[in-house]
Amino acid sequence: MTNPPGQSVSANTVAESHEGEFGCTLMDLRKLMELRGADAVAQISAHYGGVQEICTRLKTSPIEGLSGNPADLEKRRLVFGKNVIPPKRPKTFLELVWEALQDVTLIILEIAAIISLVLSFYRPPGGDNEICGHIASSPEEEEEGETGWIEGAAILASVIIVVLVTAFNDWSKEKQFRGLQSRIELEQKFSIIRNGQLIQLPVAEIVVGDIAQIKYGDLLPADGILIQGNDLKIDESSLTGESDHVKKTLDKDPMLLSGTHVMEGSGRMVVTAVGVNSQTGIIFTLLGASEEEDDDDKKKKGKKQGAPENRNKAKTQDGVALEIQPLNSQEGLDSEDKEKKIARIPKKEKSVLQGKLTRLAVQIGKAGLIMSVLTVVILILYFVVDNFVIQRREWLPECTPVYIQYFVKFFIIGVTVLVVAVPEGLPLAVTISLAYSVKKMMKDNNLVRHLDACETMGNATAICSDKTGTLTMNRMTVVQAYIGGTHYRQIPQPDVFPPKVLELIVNGISINCAYTSKIQPPEKEGGLPRQVGNKTECGLLGFVTDLKQDYQAVRNEVPEEKLFKVYTFNSVRKSMSTVIRKPEGGFRMFSKGASEIMLRRCDRILNKEGEIKSFRSKDRDNMVRNVIEPMASEGLRTICLAYRDFDGTEPSWDIEGEILTSLICIAVVGIEDPVRPEVPDAIAKCKRAGITVRMVTGDNVNTARAIATKCGILTPKDDFLCLEGKEFNSLIRNEKGEVEQEKLDKIWPKLRVLARSSPTDKHTLVKGIIDSTAGEQRQVVAVTGDGTNDGPALKKADVGFAMGIAGTDVAKEASDIILTDDNFTSIVKAVMWGRNVYDSISKFLQFQLTVNVVAVIVAFTGACITQDSPLKAVQMLWVNLIMDTFASLALATEPPTESLLRRRPYGRNKPLISRTMMKNILGHAVYQLLIVFLLVFAGDTLFDIDSGRKAPLNSPPSQHYTIVFNTFVLMQLFNEINARKIHGEKNVFAGVYRNIIFCTVVLGTFFCQIMIVELGGKPFSCTSLTMEQWMWCLFIGIGELLWGQVISAIPTKSLKFLKEAGHGSDKEDISRDTEGMDEIDLAEMELRRGQILWVRGLNRIQTQIRVVKLFHNNHEVAHKPKNRSSIHTFMTQPEYPADDELSQSFLDIQEGNPELVSKAGTSVLLLDGEAASHDNINNNAVDCHQVQIVASHSDSPLPSLETPV
């Protein structure tokens, strides 16, 4: 095998010198981790003498872990590698400049400017210009004619400025995102035992020899071998394609692989491979190989150029891909086949906003193209007819360059019309707004994984929220108990219980709770004890402490490795059971779980003397009516504690139906989880904002109803539904058990609480609401989740929220936004930010479209009437710069206000440009056009100055057209203030001082305009103005604000003839409309540059594993993600990268051509993104009690920065 990537020869030499200090080498461990099942067990036993011996060779203790000695840790990193994957260097500023130069419109402008520059030096022979139609009326103008090169040079200079600004934007965004990425990396931690202490360690610091504590929901950050496990089941579909969960035991299959998910149970493992030496790291190695091959091919063939998509491809090739040395491999397919395969890959589903922006941008671009072509054609026809028909001139050979110069000038005017018309600033505004919002949302405890989720939340019409930890504080406390036939409203003293009962309570809780759940001293004196681990279990452990007992002493007597069998909690069992050996022989099993479910498994109960008596169905009904329901009505979660002894013959532990029955009830406890004090107000805000909040919980229906009432989801006078999962299913399914949308449509509008629900129920509800067409508009649904089984619902939702504190890695990977404080109020803030993004885009659109309409009409009309554009090419480029970069920066960074929550959601189909906005756009366009045309055709008379109309080629700048240009720009500047309000508000200055960026941009633009007019001279076709002329320009500009008040006073309802624009379409239409997908998606293309995105999911993991198995010719095949991140962080942490599409082609071919892998003699199970996108993909998996976490729709297959594995 080749050396691991990222290590130089000298580094390898040093590493080899230290390898002798350990009992096994890096290559030994890599080979060992490639084995599975019985082969691995045999190799561990024969070659190493067991797992304990491997620990000894790695100089680690399976109980105490590593000592944490810095020198020892550094030595391990040197010998076995670090738990990171090295990134490729970032692109330099010059590379970004070169990529910005690939813009097709800029290229056309550059060519035209160069031609103009060259021809400007040409003079007809003999100096007689009159014969060519160019009359030099004075020596002064002849001198000016000699400086005709300035306009061409100025256009080139303007292009350079535009390119530099674009490159700087890309560079600064990438730098910002990289900084943000490195900050978040530090938050990703894993449970590691060092010096006998369980600590949370950043995954990048994990080394070979570490002892890792693994539990339900974890995403494994490294390869390892199981030391001790409790009912451990792993989802290895990301590596093998096998959807069944793999049971891990010491004697059958102890191999644990990075990138796989813990679906059930817990355990400990010794880390044997990290970083690029882990099984997943080896895949990254091959990925690096294919990337280098692609790069070589690209260099040989040269770049195809011209198309905008190529320009964006170049832009997205950011230097954040892996820099990994390839293993020996062969080329899979030739380039032509690659391109065909890539072309067939279905395009991703767009977000609501992206779909609307794409359509609008294409429509505006087409209109601009038509206007620019018309402008050029009319100018050329006007010139030809005037010179060769009306004036009857002949086409003389010596005049050809002069005529060409005129034609080039006309062409430049046409191109500048196109530059102004095409909404290049629109995608930039989206990117700036989203990036700004994402950064600010982090302060509001929203960690955005997928950029489009930010704006989608602004459209949310429904929120399906968990109860525990989201609406409640997730601080569990036992406040009531039913023990020995007595209902204690307060926790009694321990001496009221018989010693046997007290011992069973203490042992049952201490042993039958995960050993990772603990009660620790408060951080501050006088504070509450800290609850670490599962909060329900912490509540029970707190109950033991309240009884003045020590749970840790019991755990010390029965350490985790002595537990005989553990049935871990899952959504099917709704309970947890632990079996231990009794000292006198036989076994004892402790169980705990939901009271209604556990009581059905009990046939005996302890009385107050601690004696066992029978427990009949009548007794059960009495307990439910007199104990459980009163507790639940107070909002308490009821947990039943039970046990069972097994004497005599050892039972078959795998037959759960026989084991988890005939239990003896010890106690029922009522656990309080108080509602967060800020939640009722947050839910009231949601109601005002037109958002329906539904609670989906696994708790008892009475508990759920009580909490929902406290939160404000339900009020006493409401007639809303509060259903249990079983009843919900009976109402929505037919005789065959299939969900009927029509039945579901009758239920969900009134449903507010779904209790005792399974993950399947949650997914069914979310899917049903999203697919429903019963209402006036389609619903946009947000969902919260924290468990591994919440994955399908989180993926199906328009926006999935995972819990940052209580959430599992699987839930986080499936989500779009992570709530770092697990608080419902943070969701409301996300709604506010989402609506603010939508408004920011609308503000920019209102401003930009006004400029578009006016600039294009002025250039077109001026060209038709005066054979010249009143706004020169360089001036138009300056206007374009104001309009695109500066305005997007100013309008896209407005902070949100509470007023955003006082209106109803926009929904999927509401247009981007409302009738009010259309009124503002056209109203201001009318004002500006009247002023500009007045100044163009009467300005010379009004100001008593020389006319600038029909000026000869290369004539000097005139005050007349300078006033036109200056007034035009000042009107845009003041209209930018008007554009801050899009809903007809009167006060356009409200909150303006809170937005420092806006004030800076407006003042900065005004200062630049003064410099351009006064000092710009010939390059900008300007000449200095008098103070009086400046005052008039300023007065007309301020008139925009006054005119804005007039427009806002006109009732929009009375302007029914106005049309809305920027309509969206349903999500299905967007994703299935292949013709629309082939159009240039400007919004998407810009968003894919330097944006924040997290790489998602498992579908690409499977692809890359196929590549590995193809090259190694092994027997297992599947998919793997395209990202170049580490295994742990690509699931649980955001990315701030830019795409490299060409380097992905190799993997895309594998994905698009499973037959290729099949030919290698392997069997393929497809679990890819295409299959995952179907609506009902998860149902069967969940119903079979096996949840396949389906890969999310990839917004962009982006590579990552350096992130830990």
From Swiss-Prot:
Q: Which residues lie on this side of the membrane: Extracellular?
A: 122-147, 391-409, 866-872, 943-956, 1017-1029
The entry's keywords:
ATP-binding, Calcium, Calcium transport, Calmodulin-binding, Cell membrane, Cell projection, Cilium, Flagellum, Ion transport, Magnesium, Membrane, Metal-binding, Methylation, Nucleotide-binding, Phosphoprotein, Translocase, Transmembrane, Transmembrane helix, Transport
Gene3D superfamilies reported in the protein's UniProt record: Calcium-transporting ATPase, cytoplasmic domain N, Calcium-transporting ATPase, cytoplasmic transduction domain A, Calcium-transporting ATPase, transmembrane domain, HAD superfamily/HAD-like
Q: In which tissues is it expressed?
A: Specifically expressed by sperm in testis (at protein level).
Membrane-spanning regions, if any?
101-121, 148-168, 370-390, 410-430, 845-865, 873-893, 920-942, 957-979, 996-1016, 1030-1050
* EC identifiers of the protein: 7.2.2.10
Residue ranges annotated as Cytoplasmic topological domain: 1-100, 169-369, 431-844, 894-919, 980-995, 1051-1205
Please give the superkingdom of this protein's source: Eukaryota
Q: Per the entry, what modulates this protein's activity?
A: Activated by calcium/calmodulin.
The UniProt annotation places Mg(2+) binding at 786, 790
The record's GO CC annotations read: basolateral plasma membrane; ciliary basal body; glutamatergic synapse; membrane raft; mitochondrion; plasma membrane; presynaptic active zone membrane; sarcolemma
GO terms (molecular function) for this protein are: ATP binding; ATP hydrolysis activity; calmodulin binding; metal ion binding; nitric-oxide synthase binding; nitric-oxide synthase inhibitor activity; P-type calcium transporter activity; PDZ domain binding
- What residues bear Phosphoserine in this entry? 329, 335, 1065, 1071, 1145
Q: Where is this region: Calmodulin-binding subdomain A?
A: 1087-1104
Short name of one Pfam family: Hydrolase
User: What is the protein's name according to its record?
Assistant: Plasma membrane calcium-transporting ATPase 4
Q: Which organism is it from?
A: Mus musculus (Mouse)
Gene designation: Atp2b4
